[in-house]
């Protein structure tokens, strides 16, 4: 193990439809992008993302599919031994949200009882199709949800912090320094961010619809 290498490491699988921004998201973390490794047998890039917490450094080895999800499901080898996961959809594309239950099903079939965060990416785009009130899957399955914008770094650290608290078992765990991130390609409009945060809060306090439908 290299000098100063974090002792605590977790395999994190990043799943969701092609084109939802998974690779853009993981590439924001500059050291992880610099040190990524390609696993040819599975067609996967593994990005080592280190975060410094008040409990020491932790590393997520983030498995990114390199686009093969466009050709159907992923092989079980991708999921095996995953300790946590992020499922991503694109808030400007309803079909990517409709497919979230399929990704969740594939994931929990191989990895039972791992902490999972659902992320709605591209919230910087004004023409949002999947609104806060229609994002209910995470509430039915006890997942955490965050609006994110990979290109503006908006909420980049939130999924990793929530997962770290679950994995370490410390609800008071905090990041003590932010990792070096690629400069924002676009700026998130603060008033839009505030509106979305308000919408999510309202949605979270609204009773779930009764229907048994998965969405």
From Swiss-Prot:
Cofactor section: Mg(2+)
EC class (word): hydrolase
Keyword Transcription: no
Reactions performed catalytically: GTP + H2O = GDP + phosphate + H(+)
InterPro entries (UniProt xref): P-loop_NTPase, Ran_GTPase, Small_GTP-bd, Small_GTPase
EC annotation from Swiss-Prot or TrEMBL: 3.6.5.-
Textual note on the cofactor: Mg(2+) interacts primarily with the phosphate groups of the bound guanine nucleotide.
Positions marked as site (Essential for GTP hydrolysis): 68
GO cellular component, one term: nucleus
UniProt keyword annotation of Nucleus present: yes
Chief location: nucleus
Chain residue ranges for the region called Switch-I: 36-44
Domain Small GTPase Ran-type: 6-170
Chain sites annotated for binding GTP: 17-24, 35-41, 67, 121-124, 149-151
UniProt region (Interaction with RANBP1), positions on chain: 210-215
NCBIfam families linked to this entry: small_GTP
Family: Belongs to the small GTPase superfamily. Ran family.
Oligomeric and partner information: Monomer. Interacts with RANGAP1, which promotes RAN-mediated GTP hydrolysis. Interacts with KPNB1. Interaction with KPNB1 inhibits RANGAP1-mediated stimulation of GTPase activity. Interacts with RCC1 which promotes the exchange of RAN-bound GDP by GTP. Interaction with KPNB1 inhibits RCC1-mediated exchange of RAN-bound GDP by GTP. Interacts (GTP-bound form) with TNPO1; the interaction is direct. Interacts (GTP-bound form) with TNPO3; the interaction is direct. Interacts with KPNB1 and with TNPO1; both inhibit RAN GTPase activity.
Protein name: GTP-binding nuclear protein Ran
């Amino acid at each position: 193990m290299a000098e100063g290498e974090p002792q605590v490491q977790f395999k994190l699988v990043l799943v969701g439809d092609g084109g939802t921004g998974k690779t853009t998201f993981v590439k924001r973390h500059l050291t992880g992008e610099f040190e990524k490794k390609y696993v040819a047998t599975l067609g996967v890039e593994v990005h080592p993302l280190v975060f410094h917490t008040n409990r020491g450094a932790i590393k997520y080895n983030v498995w990114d599919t390199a686009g093969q999800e466009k050709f159907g499901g992923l092989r079980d080898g991708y999921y095996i031994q995953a300790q946590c996961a992020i499922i991503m959809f694109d808030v400007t594309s309803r079909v990517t949200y409709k497919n979230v239950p399929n990704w969740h099903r594939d994931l929990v079939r191989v990895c039972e009882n791992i902490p999972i965060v659902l992320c709605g990416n591209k919230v910087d785009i004004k023409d949002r199709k999947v609104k806060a009130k229609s994002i209910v899957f995470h509430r039915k399955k006890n997942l955490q949800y965050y609006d994110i914008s990979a290109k503006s770094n908006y909420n980049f650290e939130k999924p990793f912090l929530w997962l770290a608290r679950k994995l370490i078992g410390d609800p008071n765990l905090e990041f003590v320094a932010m990792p070096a991130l690629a400069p924002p390609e676009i700026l998130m409009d603060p008033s839009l961010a505030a509106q979305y945060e308000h919408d999510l809060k309202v949605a979270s306090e609204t009773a779930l619809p009764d229907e048994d439908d998965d969405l």
